[in-house]
Amino acid sequence: MANTLEQLKLYTTIVADTGDIEAIKRYQPEDATTNPSLILKAAQIPEYESLIDNAIDWAKSQSANLAQQLDDASDKLAVNIGVEILKLVPGRISTEVDARLSFDKEQSIAKAHKLVRLYQEAGVDKSRILIKLASTWEGICAARELEKEGINCNLTLLFSFAQARACAEAGAYLISPFVGRILDWYKKDTGKDYDAVNDPGVVSVTEIYNYYKQHGFNTVVMGASFRNIGEIIELAGCDRLTIGPSLLEELANSQIDITPKLVAATSTVAAEAPLTEAQFRWDFNQDPMAVDKLAEGIRNFAIDQGKLEVMLTAKLAN
């Protein structure tokens, strides 16, 4: 009998949620995703020292201004790690725009252009890149413009149906609804435990997936942020699932019979009129879990970006 991971790959594209080259070699995913927290973790792996040195040297060659050097080194390091990962996966790498730009459409677009340019200078075509943006109204509007330019986007930190609907209406290439973080909130709020079938994160992704397929949206649904393999198994059949190394290992070492739980609708109905900004903000605000988790996610990514910059500042000073 094939292991659980091998079975899952029959129904769902598996993506590695890591910047760790060794983990990617081991589990052979189709794509990989990174974020500021994963870049910070990857930057502390000894094998990446040369990538950091290259980013520092490049940043110093671009500007004499320390703030600009720091910005450049951070972007270049994320791209350097992405380039290494792309040597191992046949598909795409997701690289995230600075979380501190989550409420600035124009600066998010400018940062996306810079990341794409750095990848292209490293010989990577934009067809292999997904630009990750937080699923704020501003992030979604930035994605709408980038998609028109042929720059595909991954809308992340997605916790609500309102966010998912707005992303699809904007023509986003892909969304990353966060399964485990939704579960975390409900467990803390209710004091209850949930089995995988009734897991609020699983229920949310299932609702989004069904809505997209029923209304003919092409936006890819990629479940993310898992707490256990039960959540993953209940989402077999989802377009993509991005999974961290520890859960990939658990899937590879187990033999649970997998059947597809999410199945695309065979007929579609006309989509509703797109959400206005006012409707989006109201609908989103009505979901206290989503409001809490989006704000927390942006803050935490910004904190880890700051930690990375402290590390890079010390190296720039040498």
Swiss-Prot record:
Q: Name one Pfam family in it.
A: TAL_FSA
- The active site annotation covers K132
The pathway entry for this protein reads as: Carbohydrate degradation; pentose phosphate pathway; D-glyceraldehyde 3-phosphate and beta-D-fructose 6-phosphate from D-ribose 5-phosphate and D-xylulose 5-phosphate (non-oxidative stage): step 2/3
Q: Which InterPro entries match?
A: Aldolase_TIM, TAL/FSA, Transaldolase_1, Transaldolase_AS
Entry superkingdom: Bacteria
Enzyme Commission designation: 2.2.1.2
Molecular function via GO: transaldolase activity
State any GO CC term. cytosol
**Cell compartment(s), UniProt:** Cytoplasm
Gene Ontology biological process terms, A to Z: carbohydrate metabolic process; pentose-phosphate shunt
Entry-linked Gene3D superfamilies = Aldolase class I
UniProt keyword list: Cytoplasm, Pentose shunt, Schiff base, Transferase
Residue stretches in coiled coil: none
Substrates-to-products reaction catalysed:
D-sedoheptulose 7-phosphate + D-glyceraldehyde 3-phosphate = D-erythrose 4-phosphate + beta-D-fructose 6-phosphate
Q: Quaternary structure per UniProt?
A: Homodimer.
Per the entry, what this protein does is:
Transaldolase is important for the balance of metabolites in the pentose-phosphate pathway.
Q: What family is this protein classified in?
A: Belongs to the transaldolase family. Type 1 subfamily.
**Name of the protein:** Transaldolase
Source organism: Shewanella baltica (strain OS155 / ATCC BAA-1091)
Species classification: Bacteria, Pseudomonadati, Pseudomonadota, Gammaproteobacteria, Alteromonadales
